[in-house]
Regions:
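Short hydrophobic alpha-helical membrane-anchoring segments
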Residues: 24-25, 103-107, 150-155, 176-180
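Membrane-interface transmembrane helices that cradle and orient dolichyl/undecaprenyl
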Residues: 145-163
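Membrane-embedded, hydrophobic transmembrane alpha-helices
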Residues: 1-6
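Active-site lumenal/periplasmic loops and adjacent helix-entry segments of GT-C-fold
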Residues: 9-10, 18-144
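Residue-level signature of transmembrane alpha-helical entry/exit and packing/kink sites
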Residues: 9-13, 115, 164-168
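Membrane-interface alpha helices of multi-pass inner-membrane proteins
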Residues: 164-180
């Protein structure tokens, strides 16, 4: 079976988005995961105080890495309800995850088919379906970290690598303010 690039990209997007939509559909109005509750506390603190780094005794590290919650607050400031803003961040993060995973593997192997297969293999893991569908900092940090790899892989073959390396640097800074382990 040979897919066009457009068909492969559509399949990658579907593999990325549908599992998170199905998992979130079980309780669309409330985050029920333990980590999600902890991050919602940090998000609520940022929204109510209009400032970062408010203490969260439930997850002390969370306020020190507010990238996820700050991004959600920015989306919320567009007039979108808090839960909907959080869903936007989760879904966009998932789209970035599958597209940069596909691109990274394609850049490293030279095969667009390998990129699509990498996404399909990752999509069958429980981590992909559940852990990376949560409202938690790794959901945003992993795609950002993988974007660094993708941009550096592209830069090595580029005639003008500086913009790509600049983008990788921005992504590294975003990871640094989003997750303490990634």
């Amino acid at each position: 079976l040979s897919l066009s690039r457009r068909s492969r990209n559509a399949a990658v997007v579907c593999l990325g988005v549908f599992p998170v939509l199905m998992w979130r559909a079980s309780n669309p109005l409330l985050f029920t995961g333990f980590d999600e509750q902890l991050h919602m506390r940090t998000l609520g603190d940022i929204i109510s105080s209009h400032g970062l780094f408010q203490a969260n005794p439930l997850l002390e590290v969370s306020p020190r890495y507010p990238g996820l919650e700050a991004t959600t607050t920015l989306v919320h400031q567009l007039g979108i309800p808090t839960m909907a803003a959080a869903y936007v961040v989760i879904i966009v993060s998932r789209l970035v995850l599958v597209t940069v995973l596909c691109d990274t593997v394609e850049q490293l192997t030279g095969s667009s088919r390998a990129g699509g297969i990498a996404v399909a293999v990752y999509a069958i893991s429980p981590q992909f379906v559940f852990f990376n569908s949560q409202y938690a900092y790794q959901t945003m940090a992993i795609p950002l970290a993988l974007a660094v790899v993708s941009l550096v892989a592209r830069a090595r073959l580029s005639d003008n690598p500086l913009p790509l390396l600049g983008g990788a640097t921005v992504c590294l800074f975003a990871v640094a303010v989003t997750h303490h382990v990634t």
